[in-house]
Amino acid sequence: MSKSSNAAQGRLAGRVALVTGAGPGLGGAIALAMAQEGANLVVCDINSEALSHTEKALAATGVECLALRCDVSDSAAVDAMFSQAFERFGTVDILVNNAARVPTSPAEESRRNRHYAYLTTPMERQSLGIVASLSDEDWLKWWDVNMHGVFFCTRAALRIMEPRRSGKIINIASIAGLGTQSMHSPGYSATKAGVISLTKTTALDVAGANIHVNAIACGAVLTPPFQAYLETATAAQRNSLFQLIPTGRIGQPAEYASLAVYLASDDHYLVGQVISPNGGAVI
């Protein structure tokens, strides 16, 4: 049986999924997993070159794909993207809010190292100086993509889903939004906590229209940026990180993608839930 035949019989056959932040990494893995289950895809990313890799992978599955460059922090750009998706496919059945800014700058790496040392090395208890050192720009930059982008895309999707009384929205959150697992980046943690709260309030709002909204609070994901960090980290830094995860390893994008497919399907009764695959880092 061909790949296209398998997709035609998949759990998401005939549906249209829109995945943001769909370049290589978690978003691309989610898009590919949904295509393999039969969904047609609208994929977007702010990086056109990164998006082209996902577009090629999706083409090999035999499903239809619309790839669009979009800055999700721009509400007008988001509305235009959904208009193009609707014009092409006539609906959007599934939304995956994956696009996010992650802490990767040199200053953020320094904060990360201080945080890991605090957790794993005996030292005098003192302030890490992280929050007090943040500039207005350091703080505000997180909200445009991680919070506003999720809201803009959710609003646009609901304008399509509510009249049809059907839809699935999956928000990609983080264990950083559940506790202090990203203490080195207060802005990231705060926005991911905001995504969790928005998930619950939106779920309550639209459940009566048969629209199910849930979140995945990811633990560490072995994406290209995370792999790059591991390659530059010292052995001691890597060991300290792995000691924080009971399974002793980082989660693969495909492991998270399979959960997203499940939440996009009709195989569950979940509404407003936050599911956290994290290797036991948070229990």
What are these regions (language model features)?
Residues 8, 108-115, 208, 220-245:
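A glycine/serine/threonine-rich, flexible loop-to-helix segment
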Residues 10-42:
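Canonical Rossmann dinucleotide-binding motif of NAD(H)/NADP(H)-dependent dehydrogenases/reductases
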Residues 89, 166, 249-277, 282:
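C-terminal substrate-recognition "lid" of short-chain dehydrogenase/reductases
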Residues 101, 111-152, 166, 170, ...:
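Catalytic Tyr-X3-Lys loop
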Residues 154, 191, 199:
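Active-site helix of classical SDR
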Residues 159, 204-205:
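Alpha-helical segment proximal to the catalytic Tyr-Lys
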Residues 174:
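Residue(s) in the substrate-gating loop at a strand-loop-helix junction
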Residues 207, 212, 270-272:
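Short, small/polar-rich loop/turn modules that mediate ligand/substrate recognition or access, typified
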